[in-house]
């Protein structure tokens, strides 16, 4: 069961009701917005965060990014950052960690915050490929999908997936004279993989499978 599948069936979930109350909106308007794909409610029952609506006709929401790096990894500081973000009124938190034990960091932060929690799965997929095989480009399509599923099972409520980095977009970038071809870290991971294998981005190629 997902919020959008229930909305398309004409059913109203407790989360939709909570969002309607928070937004001072009619529940039916929220349901229709979710069904149309104009509103999302990041909610993983494993984490069960507070209900939050994002999208058309709703209040602006603030997301706070935190996370370790290979050069600086202090889990206690990330926990404190998460607490400060929540106290300051952030509506969501994202863990962008690339250093340390990523599963432990994510699990700890999920236990720390009760608001929607997001990640960028390709970070972990790429970093584990470096550890196991020596390079980001050596990760497999299965590695990418498996990491998304693994993090969802941990309780992650929403994720960034770089579906728009495709063979076509990478080829366009190669022809342009940009100072920095790609400013997105996750996008750079995908671009390197696409250039090395001369294959389509698995998240784009098998988007329906990604949604499953």
At which residue positions do the language-model features occur?
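Alpha/beta enzyme core
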Residues: 2-212
